[in-house]
Regions:
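Classical Sec-dependent N-terminal signal peptides that target proteins to the secretory pathway
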Residues: 1-18
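Auxiliary, metal-adjacent structural segments of Zn-dependent hydrolase domains
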Residues: 19-99
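Second-shell loop/turn segments in exported
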Residues: 21-27, 101-114, 164-168, 250-253, ...
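Glycine-rich catalytic cores of cysteine/serine-nucleophile enzymes that process amide/ester linkages
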Residues: 62-64, 68-109, 240-332, 366, ...
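Activation targets extended, charge/polar-rich intrinsically disordered C-terminal tails
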Residues: 98-107, 133-169, 190-228, 353-621
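Active-site recognition of the HExxH zinc-binding catalytic motif
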Residues: 113-133, 178
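Active-site-adjacent bridging/hinge elements
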Residues: 150-158, 233-243, 256-257, 261, ...
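N-terminal regions that are enriched for targeting/export leaders
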Residues: 199-251, 259-261, 274-275
């Protein structure tokens, strides 16, 4: 028999106006519809004041059910369709849900649960059509839209199906809302696997969190150094984090660095701390940097790919001290660290999104309009109140910095806007580029080294060669025995300081020349590509290190898989470094790298000489 079922039957008050559901309550479908309704809030469809018809029908895609195993269903199979206020569900799915009771380890676990999921999914579409939840700005920021918009049919940038419970969520905003709602209702682990999404949906849909899972706050620190990449697990548990800072690297020389780089710094407390307090600011070795970057595993960087979305945009978790060295030492850029004003709930929301982004997000990097600045603003805006997020209207890292430090915006606990450079240094809001220190060393050494004739260090860096410096150092060491001992020691220290930078600067330039020359030499190209292929083999994603069911791994998944990865990785890294050394020797063996090879050999001699010199003067107090 067919009858009308009032949603208000399930409501606390029958006086609330609500939709009516029209379905065959005596059928198997009707039975599952009623089960599904008990899982939803009583007022779930109160915004809909029309009749909603639920019926079953054969779909053309039913023929893709070539297996009665849930895990073997092909992509593209339609389970349900909503057109205005009419929901149609696949009769084949209903028949399988009625007949097959076995559980599976994929999807929703059984055909019956799959049927419930389809009902919840389609009812969510009806609700969304009325309330427009899928175009909510925070939802778009969480799921990874390029920019907040009014088009709910727009395809998501994030297409990381490896970490998704159902890749159908990436079709558009509407489907993302419906798919994630299915899992929020039916999967007790969802709120721990996709915590930011779960918190948002719970608040907007009125679906309470179950609290039946234990959130795993562990992530794996990434590194530009092969031997350190994915070797250290770290926790971003809010209880262990004192502050979250906006981390801004000043402008660099490269085209893509002209506007600086936007990041975050997590002030993580050392394990021995019992309370997250100001003392944690001293635990610098435990601090982390969150950096949205283009994921590039090509040895040859393509600017056109960077402009047109050819590289994925991902959230990297790096050790703060490595990031500090990257910018202040190697790129000679200032680094600003500004504490953000956040409530405990805002900090939790920020870190939940960090977890979810790290383990699931792979968007598209666009140099102009989806870069480190825009990704950083979206991440921060999701955690802030609407009024606060509107204060950060910029998309470039420098302008974001200026918005954040404005006193009137009240986004920091400190009055930073009017501070002088000296005051910024004193309060540790600024870590200066090493240029000033290096320049001091250079200007000091100009008094003793004839080849240091350029007044400006930048000109010296472009012209200097290791052979001339080696001759200067040898002459100085041989002829300075009568020099005042403390002054001689000072010269030695300055030499080592400058040479460490010059050696690293040289080693960074060699690959650039190899890339420029490789299209002129087939054999060279083969060696360069071998190096690139080796790097690709070792270039893995977080979700490949720990292969979770979906989303953020559980603690059990993490503790089982990560040690196995570490064990396998040791041998791979050793072999990779050996192979790369062979490739590098073959590359430098080319005739047009004779200058570089000679420079490298001379740098080795300088290192030996300066080490001996330091040892010689080391006893001087």
């Amino acid at each position: 028999m067919k009858k009308l079922a009032l949603i208000s039957v399930f409501a606390l008050s029958a006086s609330i106006q609500a939709a009516t559901l029209d379905y065959d309550s005596d059928s198997f479908l009707g039975e599952v519809v009623k089960e599904s309704l008990t899982l939803l809030p009583d007022d779930y469809l109160n915004s809909v004041d029309d009749k909603i018809i639920i019926e079953q029908k054969s779909f053309q895609t039913d023929q893709l059910f070539d297996s009665e195993k849930l895990c073997s269903i092909d992509e593209g199979v339609k389970f349900g369709i909503t057109r205005k206020k009419k929901i149609t569900i696949s009769s084949k799915l209903i028949e399988l849900a009625r007949r097959i009771q076995t559980n599976s380890n994929c999807g929703h676990g059984s055909f019956r649960n799959m049927l419930k999921a389809v009902i919840i999914h389609e009812l969510t579409h009806v609700k969304d059509n009325q309330e427009k939840i899928s175009i909510n700005a925070d939802f778009q920021r969480i799921v990874g839209m390029k920019k907040v918009q009014r088009n709910s049919k727009k395809r998501l940038m994030n297409q990381n199906s490896d970490s998704s419970p159902d890749a159908y969520e990436f079709l558009n905003l509407e489907e993302s809302l419906a798919v994630n709602t299915e899992y929020l209702v039916l999967d007790p682990e969802f709120e721990c696997r996709k915590p930011a999404t779960a918190n948002f949906l719970s608040r907007k849909l009125g679906i309470p969190l179950k609290g039946e899972c234990q959130k795993n706050f562990k992530v794996i620190a990434q590194s530009a150094f092969l031997e350190d990449n994915y070797q250290l697990s770290v926790s971003i548990d809010p209880k262990r984090i004192y502050q979250i800072h906006y981390l801004f690297a000043g402008k660099g020389q490269a085209l893509m660095s002209k506007w600086g780089h936007a990041m975050f710094r997590l002030v993580v407390c050392a394990p021995f701390r019992t309370v997250a307090g100001p003392e944690c600011l001293n635990d610098v070795s435990h601090h982390l940097a969150l950096s949205y970057r283009a994921y590039m595993n090509d040895i040859n960087i393509s600017y056109s790919k960077g402009v047109f979305g050819g590289y994925p945009s991902q959230l990297f978790v790096l050790r703060y001290l490595e990031v500090q060295q990257e910018y202040t030492k190697f790129e000679l850029r200032d680094l600003f660290s500004i504490p953000l004003k956040m409530t405990a709930n805002q900090k939790r929301d920020f870190l939940d999104l960090t977890l979810e982004r790290y383990w699931t997000y792979q968007g598209k990097y666009y140099f102009i309009d989806n870069n480190c600045g825009t990704e950083t603003v979206k991440h921060l805006a999701m955690a802030l109140d609407d009024e606060e997020s509107r204060l950060i209207s910029s998309v470039t890292p420098l302008k974001i910095y200026k918005d954040i430090i404005k006193d009137k915006n009240d986004l920091t606990d400190e009055n930073i806007q009017g501070l002088s450079r000296e005051q910024m240094l004193e309060h540790h809001y600024l870590v200066e580029s090493m240029f000033s220190e290096l320049n001091d060393s250079y200007q000091f050494l100009r008094n003793y080294m004839p080849s240091f004739s350029e007044k400006k260090m930048k000109k010296f860096l472009k012209k200097t060669n290791a052979r001339a410096r080696l001759e200067d150092y040898e002459n100085f060491i041989n002829n300075s025995h009568s020099m005042e001992p403390k002054l001689r020691k000072q010269v030695a220290m300055k030499l080592v300081h400058l040479e460490r930078y010059l050696a690293s600067h040289f080693l960074q330039d060699v690959p650039k020349k190899a890339l420029q020359k490789m299209n002129e030499d087939k054999e060279l190209k083969e060696e360069v590509m071998k190096m690139g292929q080796t790097l690709k083999l070792l270039s893995v994603q977080p979700w490949e290190v720990v292969n979770a069911r979906y989303g953020v791994p559980t603690e059990e998944e993490f503790e089982i898989q990560f040690p196995v990865f570490i064990s396998q990785r040791k041998d791979e890294i050793k072999m990779s470094i050996e192979n790369q050394m062979v490739n590098l020797e073959n590359i430098l063996g080319k005739s047009y790298f004779a200058k570089e090879l000679n420079e490298l050999e001379t740098l080795k001699q300088i290192k030996t000489l300066t080490s001996e010199f330091i040892y010689l003067v080391n006893g001087i107090k």
